[in-house]
A protein has these predicted regions:
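Conserved class I S-adenosyl-L-methionine
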Residues: 87-97
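Conserved SAM/SAH-binding beta-strand->alpha-helix loop
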Residues: 116-118
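Conserved SAM-binding loop of SAM-dependent methyltransferases across substrates and taxa
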Residues: 98-108
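Conserved SAM-binding motif I beta-strand of class I
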Residues: 109-114
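N-terminal juxtadomain amphipathic helix
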Residues: 1-69
């Protein structure tokens, strides 16, 4: 049983910036109902109406997490704690963005999955194996 607990109404999709703002383009812009549900059976929080990955994760995804000093510091701190506590021989990061987290790991000990090809190219150029795919059971 899923219970809606937060309704943020209709929102434009992330990173879908309009290059030419007019009444016509605004009418064509994709909006979706952004509401959050709690699954009482599994104790999971998720979007009530997930957006198609193909629509959301494009080759022009603009947000780059490493441009934030706070994100860099936070991910470095988390990576160091995880490495100290678990001493992983290998790691997988799903949704690596531009490599803000994985850059704190040895290139031989981590693989990334990033559905936005422009971001996956960045981490590949840094020398990390990054799959330019959406994480699903086929991958």
């Amino acid at each position: 049983m899923k219970e809606k607990f937060l309704n943020l109404l209709k929102k434009p999709i992330t990173n879908s910036y309009l290059s030419n703002i007019s009444k016509k383009t605004i009418k064509k812009e994709f909006f979706y109902n952004l509401s959050v549900v709690f699954d009482k059976k599994n104790y999971l929080v998720s979007l009530a109406n997930p957006i198609s990955p193909k629509k959301q994760y494009t080759s022009k995804y603009a947000h780059r997490a490493s441009q934030s000093i706070t994100m860099n510091q936070s991910f470095k701190k988390i990576a160091l704690k995880l490495q100290k506590k678990f001493k992983p021989s290998f790691s997988l990061e799903i949704g690596s963005n531009d490599g803000v987290f994985i850059k704190n790991f040895s290139k031989k000990k981590i693989i990334a999955v990033e559905p936005c090809s422009n971001l996956a190219r960045i981490t590949n150029k840094l020398g990390y194996v990054t799959y330019d795919k959406f994480w699903n059971k086929e991958l």
